[in-house]
Design a protein with these regions (language model features):
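Short, mixed charged/polar active-site loops
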Residues: 45, 69, 102-106, 131
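Solvent-exposed strand-loop boundary residues in beta-sheet-rich modules
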Residues: 42, 67, 85-87
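Active-site loop of classical SDR/Rossmann-like NAD(P)-dependent oxidoreductases
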Residues: 106-120, 134
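A general structural signal for well-ordered alpha-helical segments in protein cores
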Residues: 4-8, 116-120, 146
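C-terminal helix-rich "cap/oligomerization" subdomain common to oxidoreductases
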Residues: 41, 121-166
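Short, solvent-exposed cationic patches
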Residues: 67-76, 165
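Short polybasic amphipathic segments
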Residues: 61-63, 77-90, 95-98
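Rossmann-like dinucleotide-binding domain that binds NAD(P)(H)
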Residues: 1-56, 60-64, 74-76
Length: 166
């Protein structure tokens, strides 16, 4: 979930001011599944889910925007933008032929394996050829939020609000 947290923090470009999380485990061990809802200062709301219980691999992101829905499938390397359109097409004499209620754009993506790309980037940073894509402040912020999500799952009755923006 740490990569999802980092991605959402980067996309939202605002501090997290609200947090609600739930999850659990199947036995006496680490947490098996988590669902966290993050509220950002700028009004963005993000919902993250991570599960070790599912037999299906799911790595996706949906972003609800003012005039579109963006859906990304990281495993299949697809990105679709759903846009609303309210255009009416009619014949010369006013008879309705059809209505375009929306359209879907398919954005071209690369099929680079994310783990390979991450390790390659790490090696380039160690060799001094690149600077880290995620700096220390970004990583610290993501880790702090991951820790708060874990605390909320471990102690669901605490009801402790997020005291300071992250």
């Amino acid at each position: 979930m740490i990569h999802d947290i980092d991605l959402v923090l980067e996309l939202a470009k605002a501090p997290v001011v609200r947090l609600a999380a739930a999850g659990g485990r199947s036995a006496d061990g680490p947490i098996d599944y988590v669902n966290a809802t993050l509220g950002f200062e700028n009004g963005v709301v993000a919902s993250l889910t991570a599960s070790k219980m599912s037999h299906r691999k799911i790595r996706s992101l949906s972003a609800h925007c003012r005039s579109s829905l963006v859906e990304t499938d990281f495993l299949n390397h697809t990105l679709h933008i759903h846009r609303r359109a309210h255009e009416w097409y009619s014949a010369d004499h006013g008879e309705l032929l059809y209505r375009n209620d929306g359209f879907i754009e398919e954005v071209s993506t690369t099929s680079i394996e994310p783990l390979y790309a991450e390790l390659e980037h790490f090696l380039q940073c160690v060799r001094g050829r690149e600077t880290p894509a995620v700096d220390g402040l970004q990583a610290s912020r993501a880790l702090k939020l991951a820790d708060l999500i874990e605390q909320a799952v471990e102690h669901p009755d605490s009801g402790a609000p997020l005291l300071a923006p992250i």
